[in-house]
């Protein structure tokens, strides 16, 4: 994949290279429409689709055999603000393939680390190196008014540990099947939307998204596992296919949808590709709407300060980046880090959570740390719903625990949900 290429108003388009077949993301300047771009009718353009997002005029353009001269002309068109090649995003968890049918809270060291329950590759952990869930639960277990988007591979919204905490679009649930009853442009979006397949059913055929949802909001029902929040409304937004892959256009439409349905926070356990102005624009639009964007730091053992990864490295006030630590309170070997760019660490090694079909499974990755941190932030929002995204990020950093290990990889250390909420009460 190529670097982002912007139009003449920003940077040169010289690096936009012709390819036998490629997909472009085009943003038009205000006041222009697709009819204003003559090259959209070029014989090399196979398809032009309006992405219909609320933060600008964006189009997905599929080309075949477009030559360098035509690409240059497209970038220099006075109607176009910028052109970039579509990026590919993926999920990359490390999966324990043995599904656990009869899970227990005692196995969730990320919520309560006894030192003996970390499992996996670590025979022993260190007691207390967790997110301090039991401490915060004495103060709050969340509120149904807090709405969190799980932007991922979808969610098994029928899972017995998740169903009661899934958002329900009542107008669609009580409406006519096949009709856009609420007039939001999305048909039958009862629990969210599937942008990978363009339909109203965000069911998860992969497992990653359901695992993330369980970390945020699995019910405290004396069965299965627990999430950080017992009271929450989760919106299932699927832009990653059942193979775990997605594209820029679906990512930005997912973020825009989350803004439209009024979420408070987005959990994003995905990454890949290079810098995308379109994706940055969508995250900025979420920030403008007062929505927190929690992002996984990445699983390539890299220093994000020196080698950016996206979407984690977008410099917007609402972006909170989460690295992963293990049961000993040390950086998970796979986790990215960054003193300036990774804001906090959370449990991410051998994390037990929900997967489709009323089952449970352990996975590892910053993908797991991200929703655990998102759940803790959701508890803070339950206490203080009027904080700005930047105020929330500042509090996450200020209340983190310096355990003597993680401070070399992040501003302070690991997330502590009790300190985060108690600090607000004080």
Which residue ranges define each predicted feature?
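Protease zymogen maturation seam
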Residues: 77-147, 155-165, 250, 410-417, ...
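Subtilisin-like serine protease catalytic core
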Residues: 134-247, 275, 287, 316-318, ...
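C-terminal subdomain of the subtilisin-like protease fold in secreted/lumenal serine endopeptidases
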Residues: 226, 259-270, 277-282, 289-291, ...
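Extracellular S/T/G-rich loop segment that most often corresponds to the catalytic His/Ser-adjacent loop
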Residues: 291, 309-382, 386, 390-394, ...
């Amino acid at each position: 994949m190529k670097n982002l290429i912007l139009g003449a108003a920003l940077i040169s388009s010289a690096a936009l290279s012709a390819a036998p077949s490629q997909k472009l993301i085009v943003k038009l300047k205000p006041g222009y429409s697709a009819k204003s771009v003559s090259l959209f009718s070029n014989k090399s353009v196979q398809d032009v689709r309006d992405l219909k997002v609320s933060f600008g005029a964006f189009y997905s353009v599929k080309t075949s055999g477009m030559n360098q001269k035509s690409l240059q002309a497209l970038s220099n068109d006075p109607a176009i603000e910028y052109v970039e090649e579509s990026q590919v995003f993926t999920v990359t968890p490390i999966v324990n393939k043995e599904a656990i049918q009869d899970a227990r809270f005692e196995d969730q060291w990320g919520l309560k680390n006894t030192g003996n329950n970390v499992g996996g590759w670590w025979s022993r952990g260190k007691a207390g190196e967790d997110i301090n869930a039991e401490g915060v639960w004495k103060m709050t277990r969340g509120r149904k008014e807090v709405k969190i988007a799980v932007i991922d591979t979808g969610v098994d919204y029928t899972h017995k540990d998740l169903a009661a905490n899934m958002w329900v679009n009542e107008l669609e649930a009580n409406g006519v099947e096949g009709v856009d009853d609420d007039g939001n442009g999305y048909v039958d979006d009862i629990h969210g939307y599937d942008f990978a397949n363009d339909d109203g059913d965000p069911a998860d055929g992969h497992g990653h998204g359901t695992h993330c949802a369980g970390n945020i909001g699995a019910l405290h029902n004396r069965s299965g596992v627990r999430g950080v929040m017992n009271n929450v409304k989760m919106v299932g937004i699927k832009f990653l296919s059942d193979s775990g892959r997605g594209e820029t256009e679906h990512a930005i439409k997912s973020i825009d949808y989350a803004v439209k349905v009024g979420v408070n926070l987005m959990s994003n356990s995905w990454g890949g590709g290079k810098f995308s102005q379109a994706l940055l624009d969508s995250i900025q639009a979420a920030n403008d709407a007062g929505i927190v964007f929690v992002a996984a730091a990445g699983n390539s053992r890299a220093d994000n300060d020196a080698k950016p990864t996206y979407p984690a490295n977008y410099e917007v006030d609402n972006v909170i980046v989460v690295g992963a630590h293990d049961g000993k309170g040390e950086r998970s070997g796979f986790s990215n880090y960054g003193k300036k760019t990774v804001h906090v660490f959370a449990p991410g090694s051998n994390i037990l959570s929900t997967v489709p079909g009323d089952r449970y499974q352990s996975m590892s990755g910053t993908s797991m740390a991200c929703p655990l941190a998102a759940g803790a932030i959701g508890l803070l929002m339950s206490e203080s719903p009027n904080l700005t995204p930047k105020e929330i990020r500042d509090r996450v950093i200020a209340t983190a625990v310096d355990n003597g290990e993680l401070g070399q990889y992040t501003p302070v250390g690991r997330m502590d949900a009790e300190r985060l909420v108690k600090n607000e009460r004080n």
